[in-house]
Amino acid sequence: MSIRPEEISSILKQEIERFSTEIETSNVGRVIQVGDGIARVYGLQSCMASELLEFPNGIMGMAFNLEEDNIGVVILGPDEDIKEGMEVRRTGRVVEVPVGPALIGRVVNALGEPLDGKGPIETDMYLPVERKAPGVITRKSVHEPLQTGLKAIDSMTPIGRGQRELIIGDRGTGKTAIAVDTIINQKGQNCICIYVGIGQKASTIAGVVKKLQETGAMEYTIVVSATASDPAPLQFLAPYAGCAMGEYFRDNGMHALIVYDDLSKHAVAYREMSLLMRRPPGREAYPGDVFYLHSRLLERAAKMSDEYGAGSLTALPIIETQAGDVSAYIPTNVISITDGQIFLETDLFNAGVRPAINVGISVSRVGGAAQIDSMKRVSGTLKLDLAQYRELAAFAQFGSDLDKATQARIIRGQRTTEILKQPQYHPLPVELQVLSIFAATNGYLDDLELEEVAAFEQELHTYFKANHPELLARIPKEKWKDIEPEVRAAVDAFKKGYGQRAAANQ
């Protein structure tokens, strides 16, 4: 076999022409210290705040402290494989998460990575976790109701779309239950829900997901999970990641509801990161910017004006108190940021009043504008009546010689308290809530035994569904003054029949 010189020269010529001299440049730093989920990196002079940094084994970190000669990096994952001297590369982008309809029905971590074993999330849309809150011009005042399905809330501390309503109470008082009931009640309301579990036990979040699946609520819900076993940086990022997912729907003219469960553990995770980074501690060892930590998150919940799509993002932050102390640092911060609070009490919970809402100090600063007319009219004096009843009940313990008017008020207060009780995972449509509260405030329950109230309410609802479905459908839409006579006549007819049946059974 003979080799011709011209062939060799032509092959060499082709190879030389194909040869490219592109040089890949990357900004590289080196790990000088690692431990407790943080790393100090030397180099990377042009690194941005909150920029994603890549370690050799694929683990990501976030630039948290930009100092004179090094960078404090929080590691978004396990830090066992990161060693001193390792290279760290810039990515040129800040922390961002996938957003869009592809996330609905999924359980993801704080970086938007799936945890439910249903395969990758098919979306090419990403948003940074830290975004500026909408300005004054782009907003509109809250005017549409967001029904929780809970009589005690929708009547006395109503929530509107775009509002921030704090749920606050000791552990074990039913805070998560209220949030989950609200999510379940959004079925058919064109509202995407996001549940963010921060620092919870993995079993607790699994229980919430199971209940949402059983009730069919997972069809319109995203769950963002940062459990107690996750590193503090992931617990810190989780609410911002969930908020970015909700903002996608808000900015596209849709309605979204986000639950942060809970922001006490979020503040603790941030405190841990700050102290490890040697930031100066303040009150209760929290860093000085812990107020801004929550205000910049909750300000992103908004009702957008019509020119900007008229979408909304409603936030239900949860705060856990210690022995009912609402004057601690984090509770007072979040109370001052939000548009009202629902305060849950251990004593009420243990007395069987569930949801265990303390009517006296629970308020909604904007939701009243969003109540439907019927609910506003029937529950107008409810809060005052209950407050007076509580006062009288405390006074009545000292003596039994009460006049008729005081006795009547106590009887009505007891029955009103009874009708506001509601079992977990049983949210009520607003028209049935109006019926129950109308019956309580107009004396239809006064002659019943306390034990009969729940059965009476159940039968009243069944009666209206069977005999007056068209009247029920009109309650949320029409003015109360136009339908009150018909509702009153129907309730009178039911009460008459109920009284006769009760007499026959005796």
Curated annotation (Swiss-Prot):
Its EC number is 7.1.2.2. ATP binds at residues 169-176. It is found in: Cell membrane. It catalyses: ATP + H2O + 4 H(+)(in) = ADP + phosphate + 5 H(+)(out). CDD domains: ATP-synt_F1_alpha_C, ATP-synt_F1_alpha_N, F1-ATPase_alpha_CD. GO terms for cellular component: plasma membrane; proton-transporting ATP synthase complex. It is a peripheral membrane protein. The record marks 362 as: Required for activity. Keywords: ATP synthesis, ATP-binding, Cell membrane, CF(1), Hydrogen ion transport, Ion transport, Membrane, Nucleotide-binding, Translocase, Transport. SUPFAM superfamilies: C-terminal domain of alpha and beta subunits of F1 ATP synthase (SSF47917), N-terminal domain of alpha and beta subunits of F1 ATP synthase (SSF50615), P-loop containing nucleoside triphosphate hydrolases (SSF52540). Its main location: membrane. One of its GO terms (molecular function) is ATP binding. NCBIfam families: atpA (TIGR00962), PRK13343.1 (NF009884). F-type ATPases have 2 components, CF(1) - the catalytic core - and CF(0) - the membrane proton channel. CF(1) has five subunits: alpha(3), beta(3), gamma(1), delta(1), epsilon(1). CF(0) has three main subunits: a(1), b(2) and c(9-12). The alpha and beta chains form an alternating ring which encloses part of the gamma chain. CF(1) is attached to CF(0) by a central stalk formed by the gamma and epsilon chains, while a peripheral stalk is formed by the delta and b chains. Belongs to the ATPase alpha/beta chains family. Produces ATP from ADP in the presence of a proton gradient across the membrane. The alpha chain is a regulatory subunit. This is ATP synthase subunit alpha.
